[in-house]
């Protein structure tokens, strides 16, 4: 089943590999609601080449702690060959299924792509969020490097979704080299 072109989507994960011979997928979770990858129900997959997401209901899923990934089994993906065809695909749910949040909580999908500023200077853009006990923002700098900053109020005091930006106040020394402010060493 192909989704309607009018549907807005939430990214909940991305297929990173096939797993085993029976059509299981390894999925990187991009949602702060991991049950989206463990509880059965409708999910959609979309490759870059697909004009619209395709329905592949979740049969079962589990967290795979050794790799920090989820193993999921979806309808219509019966074997490894079929699973390999979906590597790189996005796992989606309709935006109408967005779960309510408390104040100062954010959906990962709202943070990805935000401009990141430090003392008024563009540091880069949020390229990923690592769920590592405490969420960590991965920031891609214009010169193709990455900076990791824990997503805590003390270090990320301003998140402005309307402006599409956030401001960081990391400890001294963490980002200066990425902004061209290296100090001379003795």
From Swiss-Prot:
Family: Belongs to the RimM family.
Pfam families: PRC_RimM (PF24986), RimM (PF01782)
UniProt xrefs under HAMAP family: Ribosome_mat_RimM
Comment on protein domains: The PRC barrel domain binds ribosomal protein uS19.
Protein name in UniProt: Ribosome maturation factor RimM
UniProt cross-references to PANTHER family, sorted A to Z: RIBOSOME MATURATION FACTOR RIMM (PTHR33692:SF1)
Taxonomic path: Bacteria, Bacillati, Cyanobacteriota, Cyanophyceae, Synechococcales
Single GO biological process annotation from the record: rRNA processing
Gene3D superfamilies linked: PRC-barrel domain, RimM
Compartments, as annotated in UniProt: Cytoplasm
SUPFAM superfamilies, sorted: PRC-barrel domain, Translation proteins
InterPro entries: PRC_barrel-like_sf (IPR011033), PRC_RimM (IPR056792), RimM (IPR011961), RimM_N (IPR002676), RimM_N_sf (IPR036976), Transl_B-barrel_sf (IPR009000)
Annotated PRC barrel domain residues: 103-174
Function: An accessory protein needed during the final step in the assembly of 30S ribosomal subunit, possibly for assembly of the head region. Essential for efficient processing of 16S rRNA. May be needed both before and after RbfA during the maturation of 16S rRNA. It has affinity for free ribosomal 30S subunits but not for 70S ribosomes.
Keywords: Chaperone, Cytoplasm, Ribosome biogenesis, rRNA processing
GO molecular function: ribosome binding
Native source species: Synechococcus sp. (strain JA-3-3Ab)
Top-rank taxon: Bacteria
GO terms under cellular component: cytoplasm; ribosome
Subunit structure and binding partners: Binds ribosomal protein uS19.
């Amino acid at each position: 089943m192909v989704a309607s072109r009018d549907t807005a989507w939430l990214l909940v994960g991305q297929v990173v590999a096939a797993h085993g011979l029976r059509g299981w997928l390894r999925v990187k979770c991009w949602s702060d609601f991991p049950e989206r990858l463990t509880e059965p129900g409708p999910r959609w997959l979309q490759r870059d080449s697909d004009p619209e997401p395709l329905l592949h209901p979740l049969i079962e899923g589990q967290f795979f702690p050794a790799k920090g990934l989820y193993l999921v089994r979806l309808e219509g993906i019966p074997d490894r060959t079929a699973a390999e065809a979906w590597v790189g695909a996005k796992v989606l749910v309709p935006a109408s299924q967005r779960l309510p949040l408390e104040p100062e909580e954010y959906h990962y999908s709202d943070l990805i792509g935000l401009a990141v500023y430090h003392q008024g200077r563009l540091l880069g853009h949020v390229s990923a969020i690592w769920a590592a006990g405490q969420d960590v923002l991965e920031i891609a700098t214009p010169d193709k490097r990455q900076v990791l900053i824990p997503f805590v109020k003390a270090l990320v005091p301003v998140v402005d979704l309307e402006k599409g930006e956030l401001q960081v106040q990391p400890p001294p020394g963490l980002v200066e080299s990425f902004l061209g402010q290296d100090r001379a060493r003795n």
